[in-house]
Amino acid sequence: MAKNTDIEHDAHEPAGHGDVRESAVENPSASAVSDGEERATFAPEVAPQTDTESAQGAAQESEPEVQRAGEAEKGVPEKAKAVVPLDELLPQKVHLIPLTGRPIYPGIFTPLLISDEDDVRSVESAYSDSGFIGLCLVKTDTQNPTISDLYEVGSVARIVKKINLPDGGLNVFISTQKRFRIRKHVHHSKPIVAAVQYLSDLIEGDPLEIKALVRGLIGEMKELSENNPLFSEEMRLNMINIDHPGKIADFIASILNISKEEQQRTLEILDVRKRMEEVFVYIKKEKDLLEIQRKIQNDLNSRVEKNQREYFLREELRSIKEELGLTTDPKERDQRKFRALIDSFHFEGEVKEAVESELEKLSLTDPNSPEYSVGRTYLETVLSLPWHAPEKEEYDLKKAQKLLDEDHYGLENVKERIVEYLAVRKLRADTKGSIILLVGPPGVGKTSVGKSIARAIHKPFFRFSVGGISDEAEIKGHRRTYIGALPGKVLQGLKIVKTKAPVFMIDEVDKIGSGARGDPAGALLEVLDPEQNTTFRDHYLDLPFDLSHIVFVLTANSTDPIPRPLLDRAEIIRLSGYIDTEKVEIAKRHLVPKTLEKNGLKRACVSYRKEVLLHLVHSYARESGVRGLEKSLDKLHRKLATEIVLGKRSFDDKCLMDEALIGTFLGKPVFRDDMLKDANKVGTAVGLAWTGMGGDTLLVEAITIPGKASFKLTGQMGAVMKESASIALSWLRRYSAQQRIASPNWFEKRAIHLHIPEGATPKDGPSAGITMTTTLFSLLTQQKVKPRLAMTGELSLTGQVLPIGGLKEKTIAARRGGIKEIIMPKANVRDLDEIPEHVKKGMVFHLVESMEEVLSLAFPKGKRVRAGTAAQSASPETLTG
């Protein structure tokens, strides 16, 4: 393919006319080629000559130069030249050269760069044959165009001169002569040869109208060229010298900034009048574009002038200040900024003295010294804190209650306590802060409850965790003497929320550590204590700051590791685990929509029946919270999304999730009901335990081995639990001897092994005392414990059942595990009121005071004591939920 390098470099430059006009001035022959009509000047066979009176002078004037060029190229004597009409000399078959830029109009002298090997061979062949080539524009840019990729109308051009390039290409100087239309294809592929039909301009209509159109075109172009520096004076002169209307239209079209398609359309118009009218439209577009450019240029000039004026004024002002000694530097700007902030806060007492002193020291310090940077950072920190008094709280208690209900399902006791707290706060009109400690297993919503409190009272929320930290500087900051010192987390949070009365959540206070760098728990005491936090001193700030307006919300999994002084300062709200029905509702309302959106699925893509969600909870997510349930749902929806992407399912088809599909996606159930089956054996009993993760059921089992008397305990029991096991064995031996349940030497001839499964999990506490005693009694009497019965209670050495803790969590765990009856200490009867009614519904609670009562309930049909002694035992009290 051929490229016109002038066109490629500047879209506003006419197609080869920059070179044409320059050649026309310096070389008369070029002018003759451009302005001559229906004639060709070439060597060796013919000599240039016109057949019209108007063109004869130009042809004669250019004849010597063209003849010399012909002799130089062809080596033919001057006498061999002749004058032949152009139409007779133009070949009927031409080699076609594809053009990629723009079409080239007739009457143009321009260079062409030929780089394609096939095109080079085509030019060489045409040069040695007729000396003419056909130029056709490519419709779309392709690597190897064929004749079908070319427009049918093009220009035939005479090869004036060719120069071989070092890379094998050609630089060809051509003179275009006339339009043609491809009539027949001789060679479809390169080199492309076609039979052509030559086209002449059609001039129809009133000559005066044609003349008026010519004058109009020239006038429009004159106006356009005067305002456009891209149009040279030489172009304007050449345009005026052209006397043919069609060539004037061609010339103007070639120099306008229009698309190659528009230029091709102009090339194909043979009616000169229509061609000139088409060019008028293009000139109008160019003038509109030029007007927009002029407007943009004027705007830019105005901006530049304004910027230059401001620059000169600033320089002048700087010079004046230098003369008067009033130069403003960064240090002065810092002084003004800090002074304005200090005045706006109206500091008093120690704080005012400290910031004034620091500002004065800063004014005497070199800005390039490290001390200046330290002082400036300190002042920026002090002045970025919210020192102003907090605004009065305004919130609607009903809306707050509604907000809590929207954010959390269940947790009725927790929400009730929070609403009570907000009601008291509203009645007292007190903006003072408070300390709330949310205690519960992971995943029950402690953090989200804290966020809901902040939303309910319209306060900003800030959260940070103290789990694992062992440096008190995290709470109280570093002293300024250290490089890179920073304030503690509390003041950093206040800088972020920009108010003195936010809601601060301090997570994982039960996991706070201590080490060589101080005790963070002790540092928290000063932060939380209402008697001290009105004048809290951060190590970095070293100024009193009032923290008493902050609402502190602490979270923990257990209160056991928390220091007692810290517990005394907080109002404890316990969040127990969820039962299965609550988890199902939480999944339907929150978790299913959340995980569907997370995995790019629509709500209508999946449908869950209640019993399917219940199966998912029961088999894969029995923990106290709902994080495991969320992970299971997330995995289900990931698997479903994968099948949709792989084409195994349609995105629009609704998936009805069932137990089989859950098993396919999640694998075998994580939890099984084997515990109740295992408990229905001699030497087993089910107890209830409470941990930081919530309540849980505990299977206790025992066996005897003939041999020397011994008592072995396994299952990672703690010291307290081992003591409970020893008490259980001692009481049972005494009770068996009194009631003559077994022979006196039964214990002497057997080794007893008591075990609690899940040996990898540490276990401790006294509440398994009655469970271990019941297990040993079952082993002694070879009786099975009543099915679906669980128990909890501490046993004393005299057989009394003592109260325990965590009854609510244990009851929830029992319901989750399918337990129907619970034996519990009578002293814990008050704790039943804290258990929600929907948890107690359908369950039976046996309140006992002695171990004899426990045995009478655990073995209702078996022999417990020797005849005549049962009446000595009190009857247990039974409550139904």
Curated annotation (Swiss-Prot):
Keyword Heme: no
Species the sequence originates in: Treponema pallidum (strain Nichols)
GO cellular component: cytoplasm
Ranges annotated as biased composition (Basic and acidic residues): 1-24, 65-77
Residue span of region Disordered: 1-77
Protein name from the UniProt record: Lon protease
BP GO terms, sorted: cellular response to heat; protein quality control for misfolded or incompletely synthesized proteins
Molecular function terms, GO-annotated: ATP binding; ATP hydrolysis activity; ATP-dependent peptidase activity; sequence-specific DNA binding; serine-type endopeptidase activity
Family annotation (Pfam families): AAA (PF00004), Lon_C (PF05362), Lon_lid (PF22667), LON_substr_bdg (PF02190)
Stated role: ATP-dependent serine protease that mediates the selective degradation of mutant and abnormal proteins as well as certain short-lived regulatory proteins. Required for cellular homeostasis and for survival from DNA damage and developmental changes induced by stress. Degrades polypeptides processively to yield small peptide fragments that are 5 to 10 amino acids long. Binds to DNA in a double-stranded, site-specific manner.
Residue span, Lon proteolytic domain: 679-861
Species lineage: Bacteria, Pseudomonadati, Spirochaetota, Spirochaetia, Spirochaetales
Family indicated by similarity: Belongs to the peptidase S16 family.
Subunit structure: Homohexamer. Organized in a ring with a central cavity.
Gene3D superfamilies in UniProt: 1.10.8.60, 1.20.5.5270, 1.20.58.1480, 3.30.230.10, LON domain-like, P-loop containing nucleotide triphosphate hydrolases
Domain of life: Bacteria
SUPFAM superfamilies: P-loop containing nucleoside triphosphate hydrolases, PUA domain-like, Ribosomal protein S5 domain 2-like
The enzyme's E.C. designation: 3.4.21.53
Active-site residues (renumbered): S767, K810
Enzyme class: hydrolase
Ranges of biased composition (kind: Polar residues): 49-59
Subcellular location: Cytoplasm
The UniProt record lists the keyword Secreted: no
Binding site for ATP: G440, P441, P442, G443, V444, G445, K446, T447
Induction: By heat shock.
Domain Lon N-terminal positions: 94-287
